[in-house]
Amino acid sequence: HLTATNAQEAVNWYVKHFGGEATRFLRSTDTELPIDRVMYGDIAVIFFERDPGEGSVGSGVDHFGFSVGNVPELVADIVADGGTQLVDFVEFSGRQIGFVEDPWGTKIELINDPELRGMHHLHLSSPDPQATLQWYADNFGGESERWKDVLPGLNYGDIWLLVSQVQQAVAPTQGRSFDHLGWKFSDLTAAHRNLQANDVEFTMDPRDFRSIRIAFVEGPDGVRIELVEKD
């Protein structure tokens, strides 16, 4: 979940630059519901409509990434459309990378990785990356692998979770432009029980929300995480 002063404008901006499907809650056709999210396959980028506060940099979620074949051109388009280029282009493991910030303060990495196009990765910040990756593996699965044999991470098939080491403490994500992550469960009651057995801290126990059930936990480094059960 990201934040923006106008959810529809944010949805349009992301679709314009990164594609995806603009839609409503659960892809509803109810026109009384706002268009507040972009679907990239089964992955949703959802926007809260509020002041974005501080940006993602400096929090436990530094940025997320998209894989595209035209990194320089897309960076230029983004800068012309209210975004900001953060650093010069770099080469990493033979791939060109650019970093931008969207108009609401969330950092985005653009990488040319032909093996996985579209939504590509979540990149967290932590003083202890190995412990953070292990926590996510223990509680949310994923295959422990090195991306391109270089960066340790968790592979979820349609997205990677990567963690970089930082020396300073990181800020909690809640209230910033990248407010929280989310994971889907088929049985939230069982997930609640299993996560509690792993000493995961629940900041909101499971409850009904519209036609789904949700809960919130706090991950390492102040990362807020939503748990969702859908029919």
Language-model-detected regions and their locations in the chain:
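Vicinal oxygen chelate
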Residues: 2, 23-26, 66, 75-124, ...
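N-terminal, post-signal-peptide region of Sec/Tat-exported proteins
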Residues: 5-49
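Amphipathic alpha-helical segments
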Residues: 6-22, 77-81, 128-144
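Helix N-cap motif at beta-to-alpha junctions
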Residues: 6-7, 68-72, 128-129, 185-189
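Amphipathic N-proximal alpha-helical interface segments
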Residues: 48-51, 109-111, 166
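Post-signal peptide N-terminal segment of secreted/secretory-pathway proteins
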Residues: 53-56, 64, 69
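Eukaryotic phosphotyrosine signaling hubs
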Residues: 60-63, 177-180
